[in-house]
Amino acid sequence: MVFSKKGCRRSKIVLDFLCKESYDLRDFVALVSYLRSPNGCPWDQVQTHESIRRNFLEETYEACEAIDAGDLVHMREELGDVLMQVLFHTDIEREAGHFDIDDVADAACKKLVYRH
């Protein structure tokens, strides 16, 4: 992962994260981890599963509303918010040494293979 001292112009906080034309899932995982790091965002650093539980539910409901409305632009945004919540909760457990995003993906794939 390449990092830069310049943050994106519109950032409310200065991130040491490279601004790019487009990002992928690995960037998303790295960014969430960075935000929780000592050099990241003070708010993100202190969050727990319990403190952001409501956010997870709210983002899920907002994704459902976008699906119900057939609004693909809003749906893409809200699915990103749900994914951010998954990554955030996973990063808390990665820090604790319990599991990481690859473990979550492994368990999900195994479940799908078993069910199908």
Would you name each region that the model predicts?
Residues 1-79, 84-115:
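Flexible "arm" and connector segments at domain edges
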